[in-house]
Amino acid sequence: MNHLQQRQLFLENLLVGVNNTFHQMQKHSINTCCQSLQKILDHLILLQTIHSPAFRLDRMQLRQMQTLACLWIHQHNHDHQAMLGAIKWISPLIKELR
């Protein structure tokens, strides 16, 4: 297994763990607006990467960041500044993929 494959496997496992945590929290405390926010971020990622030569690994990293951004925004009670900060956090990576 080469370095890229090891990195991809590690990130896939990390993503599974983050998603499991997110979905467990979702059952207990995350409401519809968080689900809507996740759909918006997901759409943003898809639009920015659909015509680019982004590897699966790059998309996976963005989706992991998206999940963490949703958790961050929820923990800050959907504060507008927290939302803007999270989107800016994701956006630089999206621009690199173009």
Curated annotation (Swiss-Prot):
Pfam families given in the database record: Rota_NS6 (PF04866)
Any coiled-coil regions, as ranges: none
> What is the protein's major site of localization?
host cell
InterPro entries from the entry?
Rotavirus_NSP6 (IPR006950)
- Protein name per Swiss-Prot or TrEMBL: Non-structural protein 6
**Family under the similarity heading:** Belongs to the rotavirus A NSP6 family.
Subcellular locations according to the entry: Host cytoplasm; Host mitochondrion
Lineage of this protein's species? Viruses, Riboviria, Orthornavirae, Duplornaviricota, Resentoviricetes
Top-rank taxon of the source lineage equals: Viruses
What is a single cellular component term in the Gene Ontology annotation? host cell mitochondrion
Record keywords: Host cytoplasm, Host mitochondrion
Subunit description: Interacts with NSP2 and NSP5.
